[in-house]
């Protein structure tokens, strides 16, 4: 089992509100990164990971994955269908991918729990929209396993921000990690991030 990632920087985290779901998100990040790394090495679909990050993630060490996983926001995204009940009628493995189903199920369970306990953290940490939070809260637990078979329900986060993934995989200095942490802990900041990546951090 992967060890719990260390928080990025004490100063940045002390500036954040009380985020009791943060550790759970970081643990899911670590599992998700290892999952994507395996898929890269086996030449499987890597769920939208930007091309520029694939080489670095494919060869990343366990220690680097621990560091990247500690980013205080989900590195994955759930894409819930607008009408969950209709999807569930036909949900089922057309081409079974049990590992993807297991990963999706774990994230769905955690996202639903966070949505029920703290919609604010569900938005900030999981990147969920208000309508998605409402759908998850209304969904019976018995339907989560079936929903996890929905094609495309799980993707990488920040698929349009190659610079962010490159920075995550290359930033080793505390100052660089702190900049990313401060960005991640501002609600709504994701849509304001530049589409073009800034200068690379110094390794």
PLM feature spans:
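N-terminal interaction modules that seed assembly of large macromolecular complexes
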Residues: 34-79
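Intrinsically disordered, low-complexity acidic/Q/S/K-rich activation/interaction tracts characteristic
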Residues: 2-42
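Amphipathic alpha-helical packing elements
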Residues: 43-47, 54-57, 100, 104, ...
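Long, compositionally biased
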Residues: 71-92, 150-189
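Intrinsically disordered, low-complexity linker/tail regions enriched in Pro/Ser/Thr
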Residues: 2-15, 62-97
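Long, low-complexity acidic/proline-rich regions
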Residues: 192-203
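Extended, low-complexity, amphipathic alpha-helical coiled-coil/linker regions that act as scaffolds
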Residues: 12-22, 27-29, 51, 132-139, ...
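Surface-exposed polar/charged interaction patches
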Residues: 38-42, 94, 114-117, 150, ...
